[in-house]
Amino acid sequence: MAARLCCQLDPARDVLCLRPVGAESRGRPFSGSLGTLSSPSPSAVPTDHGAHLSLRGLPVCAFSSAGPCALRFTSARRMETTVNAHQILPKVLHKRTLGLSAMSTTDLEAYFKDCLFKDWEELGEEIRLKVFVLGGCRHKLVCAPAPCNFFTSA
């Protein structure tokens, strides 16, 4: 069974943290800078990419000490708007890749907490591929059921 994650904004460090639910005492947070818009260098992705956590459908950068590419990208505070409908997140992320206004940090936090991880872990929806492509992530998924081509998935 796949682990569940909780998503919390840490205003003191200005990061969005991901933690396994029910593992607060033993799990380290996965966090990413809210101001970083570029994908990390290959060295930012550790060789032990956390497959032991059984997190279905997350790319290897989710276990980077710098945090997941898409969360770092989609949490940039300097690109804010009132858009809050989670159904159009891929379009919102595409606008961000073009440097246009997009979803607010609060809306993104709610989306990741209430929708995205539920879709990934409970429903296995393929929207995760599109989210990470448009969010600037080019890392492979961990425990993906079949080979996937990010560039044709979007």
From Swiss-Prot:
Parts of the chain that traverse the membrane: none
Phenotypic consequence of L98F? Complete loss of interaction with human DDB1
Q: Which BP terms from GO are recorded?
A: DNA-templated transcription; symbiont-mediated activation of host NF-kappaB cascade; symbiont-mediated arrest of host cell cycle during G2/M transition; viral genome replication
- Localization of this protein: Host cytoplasm; Host nucleus; Host mitochondrion
Note down the stretches annotated as region Mitochondrial targeting sequence.
68-117
Q: Impact of changing K95E on the protein?
A: No effect on interaction with human DDB1
- Describe its PTM? A fraction may be phosphorylated in insect cells and HepG2 cells, a human hepatoblastoma cell line. Phosphorylated in vitro by host protein kinase C or mitogen-activated protein kinase. N-acetylated in insect cells.
**Sorted alphabetically, which keywords does the UniProt record give?**
Activation of host NF-kappa-B by virus, Activator, Apoptosis, Host cytoplasm, Host G2/M cell cycle arrest by virus, Host mitochondrion, Host nucleus, Host-virus interaction, Modulation of host cell cycle by virus, Transcription, Transcription regulation
Q: What is the effect of changing T36A?
A: In strain: Switzerland/Strubin/1999
Outline the subunit composition.
Answer: May form homodimer. May interact with host CEBPA, CFLAR, CREB1, DDB1, E4F1, HBXIP, HSPD1/HSP60, NFKBIA, POLR2E and SMAD4. Interacts with host SMC5-SMC6 complex and induces its degradation. Interacts with host TRPC4AP; leading to prevent ubiquitination of TRPC4AP. Interacts with host PLSCR1; this interaction promotes ubiquitination and degradation of HBx and impairs HBx-mediated cell proliferation.
Family, per the entry? Belongs to the orthohepadnavirus protein X family.
Q: What does this protein do?
A: Multifunctional protein that plays a role in silencing host antiviral defenses and promoting viral transcription. Does not seem to be essential for HBV infection. May be directly involved in development of cirrhosis and liver cancer (hepatocellular carcinoma). Most of cytosolic activities involve modulation of cytosolic calcium. The effect on apoptosis is controversial depending on the cell types in which the studies have been conducted. May induce apoptosis by localizing in mitochondria and causing loss of mitochondrial membrane potential.
- Protein name per its UniProtKB record: Protein X
> Which organism's genome codes for this protein?
Hepatitis B virus genotype D subtype ayw (isolate France/Tiollais/1979)
